[in-house]
Curated annotation (Swiss-Prot):
Gene3D superfamilies: 1.10.286.20, DNA helicase RuvA subunit, C-terminal domain (1.10.8.10), Elongation factor Ts, dimerisation domain (3.30.479.20). PROSITE patterns: EF_TS_1, EF_TS_2. It is found in: Cytoplasm. The keyword Protein biosynthesis applies. Associates with the EF-Tu.GDP complex and induces the exchange of GDP to GTP. It remains bound to the aminoacyl-tRNA.EF-Tu.GTP complex up to the GTP hydrolysis stage on the ribosome. This is Elongation factor Ts. CDD domains: UBA_EF-Ts. Residues 79-82 are annotated as: Involved in Mg(2+) ion dislocation from EF-Tu. The keyword Cytoplasm applies. Coiled coil: none annotated. It comes from the Bacteria. Keywords: Cytoplasm, Elongation factor, Protein biosynthesis. GO terms for molecular function: translation elongation factor activity. The lineage of its organism: Bacteria, Pseudomonadati, Pseudomonadota, Gammaproteobacteria, Alteromonadales.
Length: 290
């Protein structure tokens, strides 16, 4: 029997597995969809695919700096318990090595990469079947630069900093600052015009409401805008390890400059599903009956 697009679509809908996995399963069974499902269930693919639909907003951030390149990976799971699991962390570190060795910046490319003689996606499916939770590599990045630093806080926040000049220790300190202070931009002059204009409108309205004369209000707004662009930018912020100096001063004192930074935080932007305890228990009991 010919393996049609409609057949692949039906198998995807029934198992939740990826298109290529579904096509492969159908080719192996000569288009017999029921046998394909049976084989996928035996191999754990269908089970893993069903779990892939569940929200994975916990996890870990991992980093590596070596040979002029810094790599950072976010690997998600469903619970903080699994985020500390030895097998989960081992898989994460293996993915980090694969991403670094192959300069991978795309999750699809990472899933298709080879790990221990299999595709990363296949190793992931096996781990999902073993652990019983959705596990998902979410994002990965490789950057190159003159001086690179990486810092991970509690496994949940990771930062790569890219400097010119200075050394790795300085770059790590800058990365630590970014993890703690979460600046939105690198330098005050990097703050987009639309962001500046929006804040300026707010500050003008505040000044007008305060009843200040126009010339005083204008000076107030100018001062507040300078403070605002400093607060939201890395170099304008007080250095977390020594608030008596700014990050800009720290860099200048070490004959260095910051080019950019990348900050990952576990689960940011993922809408978490909330359930009350009774509903969660009821759902688990219902699942146990199946």
């Amino acid at each position: 029997m010919a393996v049609t697009a409609a057949l692949v679509k039906e198998l995807r809908e029934r198992t939740g597995a990826g298109m290529l996995d579904c096509k492969k399963a159908l080719v192996e069974t000569d288009g017999d969809i029921e046998l394909a499902i049976e084989n996928m269930r035996k191999s754990g693919q269908a089970k893993a695919a069903k779990k892939a639909g569940r929200i994975a907003a916990e996890g870990v951030i991992l980093t590596k700096v070596e040979g002029g390149r810094a790599t950072m990976l976010e690997l998600n799971c469903e619970t903080d318990f699994v985020a500390r699991d030895e097998g989960f962390l081992k898989f994460g570190n293996e993915l980090l090595e694969v991403a670094a060795a192959n300069n991978i910046n795309d999750i699809d490319a990472l899933n298709d990469a080879e790990l221990n003689g299999s595709k990363v996606s296949e190793v992931r499916d096996a781990l999902v079947a073993k652990i019983g939770e959705n596990i998902s590599p979410r994002r990965v990045i490789n950057v190159e630069g003159d001086t690179l630093g990486a810092y991970v806080h509690g496994g949940r926040i990771g930062v790569i900093s890219i400097l010119t000049g200075g050394d790795e220790e300085l770059a790590k300190d800058v990365a630590m600052h970014v993890a703690a202070a979460s600046p939105q931009f690198v330098k005050p002059e990097n703050v987009p015009a639309e962001v500046v204009e929006k804040e300026k409108e707010i500050q003008i309205e505040i000044a007008i409401q305060s009843g200040k004369p126009a010339e005083i209000a204008e000076k107030m707004v100018a001062g507040r805008m300078k403070k605002f662009t400093g607060e939201v930018s890395l170099t304008g912020q007080p250095f977390v390890k020594d608030p008596s100096i700014s990050v800009a001063e720290l860099l200048k004192n070490n004959s260095a400059d910051v080019i950019n930074f990348v900050r990952f935080e576990v689960g940011e932007g993922i809408e978490k599903k909330t359930e009350d305890f009774a509903a969660e228990v009821a759902a688990q009991m219902e699942a146990a009956k199946k």
